[in-house]
Amino acid sequence: MRKLTKGFLIFGVVSTILGFIMIIVGAQSNGIQSLLAMSKDPVYDNRTEEVTFGSEVEKLDLTLEEHSLTITESVDDKIHITYHPSVSGRHDLTTGMSDKTLSVTDKQASQHRFLGSGIESLLRIASNYSNRFDEVVLSLPKGRKLQAITVSANRRQTTIINATLENATLNTNGYLLRIEGSRIKNSKFTTPNIINIFKTELTDSQVKTEGRHLHVEDIQIHGKVELVACSLSRKIRS
């Protein structure tokens, strides 16, 4: 009996040592990164990447499924898009140009292998932890108007802050659309959920939620403006 107990003890010690060695080797050889890359949910890095576009862009088409979105004003006359890349690369942004229209999306085909419920749970925790890095920041050109802006953003929160949007169509399925300190003209925004608008100038535009929560504070109205909620519909003319 003592020999059997001693054998199990030796086996346990050896297994523990081998486990630590494998962890060290895996970390040194990017094994952890490779494991994270197998997650079916996006796991984002804390480093930032940026792409920039100039006057060659006259129209913008942005579609996001795996990122939250913040729209603001650029410091120059260029379009700047910043984001945190995903470990797998499957959820990174891809861009394309056609007829002076810039298309940006994070919708990519992804393959996922079954790794076992334990590892899947750990990867899900890692994904949730990295969600604070899921934001895409779109900085629109300062002093230059685009002919058309089309945005579809379907994750978490969409924020428009200190920005000027004209000829814009925005559809979002996130839980919140927040607009603050901005100028919106000839545009249409639609969401099924919460809309909060603060210190914003609205001109000939429609803001619509299919839900019941549409909150506005300190806004200026010019031309025909529609603020529409499930329980409230206001058509306002200056």
Predicted regions and their residues:
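Cationic, amphipathic, low-complexity alpha-helical segments enriched
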Residues: 228, 232, 236-237
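Histidine- and/or cysteine-centered catalytic micro-motif in compact active-site loops
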Residues: 219-221, 230
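Acidic (Asp/Glu) and glycine-rich low-complexity loops/linkers
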Residues: 2-59, 68-155, 159-172, 178-191, ...
